[in-house]
Regions:
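Extracellular carbohydrate-recognition regions
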Residues: 21-59
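Beta-strand-rich interaction surfaces with strong enrichment in secreted/lumenal proteins
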Residues: 29-30, 93-100, 188-195, 236-237
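Short tryptophan-centered beta-strand motifs in secreted/extracellular beta-sheet-rich domains
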Residues: 44, 109, 199-208, 212-214
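Short, aromatic/His-centered strand-loop micro-motif at the edge of beta-sheets
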Residues: 157-202
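Flexible glycan-contacting loops in extracellular carbohydrate-active proteins
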Residues: 224-252
Length: 256
């Protein structure tokens, strides 16, 4: 088998918050195939062209490559996209994105933590830079760390400009945010335990109405309802990688 610093989000400490409902027994890869249309596929069977923004080819772009053009953060090797973020040098995690364009739909990604750096993690999800009132268009993400998986609605959570300013004001004054504000922010995410390894995994991340779901190896491991997931246009699919991750295959599907 073929083988933005992870953006500091100014979040409250991530407590483990279990979903109120057990994740449904369903096959979201089959849902995408049966109900949707595949609008993009990349198996990375080529060589990249240099280190700059469009070097990966096939429509991929990097928001961070130009910060350190002398350092290669994405390497195509034997059909694998090997991401090694120059986070310290760039002052930002490697941020790689591709056009998407759907309301409901999702992505299927084959990935691996190669074990080349400590604390390997992967953030992947959806962006709409045309959205007003949301920092950098950040909509919603799945985040895989060494010990947990997070689903998070940024559009109506901490990346909402009003919420972001309110939190920054508390930090500037060195005040603890009030309980109602913390409760609001915490309601915009769900965190479930997960133990990372160095094996290949098939990941499915979908948006269906106001729900986001993440599956690993054909099993839904996290689901969460929040109004931001229903944003009508997920224009970009993006990876944010603070260290090292290998990507073997990416498919983007549109259901509507």
């Amino acid at each position: 088998m073929k083988s933005f610093l992870f953006t500091t989000l100014l979040l409250a400490p991530l407590a483990v918050v279990q979903a109120t409902d057990t994740p449904p027994l369903r096959d979201d890869a089959a849902w995408l195939r049966d109900k949707g249309q595949m609008i993009f596929h990349d198996a990375f069977e080529r060589e990249e062209d240099g280190n700059l923004a469009k070097a990966i080819g096939n429509g991929w772009n990097s928001a961070t490559a130009g910060r350190v053009p002398q350092i290669k953060m994405a390497n195509l090797d034997d059909g694998i996209l090997k991401i090694a973020s120059a986070t310290k040098e760039a002052g930002h995690a490697a941020h790689i994105h591709h056009e998407a364009g759907f309301t409901d739909g999702g992505v299927i990604v084959r990935f691996r933590f190669p074990g080349l750096s400590q604390g390997e993690s992967l953030q992947l999800g959806f962006v709409d830079r045309e959205t007003k009132g949301v920092h950098a268009g950040h909509l919603c993400y799945g985040i895989l760390s060494q010990s947990s998986i997070t689903l998070i609605d940024h559009k109506t959570g901490i990346m909402n400009l009003e919420n972001r300013k309110r939190r920054e004001d508390y930090l500037t004054r060195k005040e603890k945010p009030p309980a109602d504000f913390e409760a609001l922010i915490n309601s915009k995410k769900v965190v479930v335990p997960w133990k990372a390894d160095t094996e290949w995994h098939d990941l499915v991340l979908v948006n269906e109405g106001d729900e986001m779901r993440l599956s690993l190896d054909s099993k839904v491991v996290a689901s969460h309802h929040s109004e931001g997931y229903a944003h009508p246009m997920k224009r970009w699919f993006s990876f944010l990688v603070p260290n090292t991750v290998w990507i073997d295959d990416v498919k983007i599907w549109k259901v509507k």
